[in-house]
Amino acid sequence: MTTYDDLKALFLNCSIKYDAAQSHTRRLLARSAGIMDSQGVDVEILHVLEHEIGFGMVKDATEDGSRSRDDWPGIQRRIMDADILVIGTPIWLGMKSSVSMLVIERMYAYSGDRNEKGQYLYYGKTAGCVVTGNEDGIKACAMQILYAMAHIGYTIPPQPDCGWIGEAGPGPSYGD
């Protein structure tokens, strides 16, 4: 049996809920992470809102004095250590969360950097996404996230997205 114990996957939960335990996105991310874990992949799920992250396409928002704390450089190191990056987002008004956009902007700040071989930093890494919500837009959100990841250098495999969508409007969410 093939195992993938030489791979590391980072799942970024871009829920707009501060409490990770209340996040429906986290619950679906956990299912995807469980599949990878069962195949030997080293898996980590990070709840983005548990960290202080400055805005803008900057590597460290403390360098210009606009913020006294920015946890992004540490998150970026975790991204760089991962072979696989999965961005999880809820759908709000048919769009990905503002937290997922913040993650993409911060990653983009590194997109011009090169590794020791002269390749873009994200070269050779794979990305995917998980989308949850009670309204239409899974494919549109996935398209935006996956295009951004491809644009900065990630490889996007076939069927790189999954999602759960309930009936439009108020009602049960994924974890209910």
What are these regions (language model features)?
Residues 57, 92-93, 136, 173-176:
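A general structural signal for short secondary-structure boundary/capping elements
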Residues 71-82, 119-122, 144-153, 170-175:
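Short, surface-exposed, charge-dense and proline/glycine-enriched linear segments
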Residues 116-166:
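Short, glycine-/small-residue-rich phosphate/pyrophosphate-handling segment
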Residues 1-117:
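N-terminal beta1-alpha1-beta2 submodule of the flavodoxin-like/Rossmannoid cofactor-binding fold
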Residues 18-22, 131, 176:
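Active-site oxyanion-binding pockets that recognize sulfate/phosphate
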Residues 1-3, 155-176:
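C-terminal and late-domain segments of enzyme folds
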Residues 35, 62, 105-106, 112, ...:
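Alpha-helix boundary/capping detector
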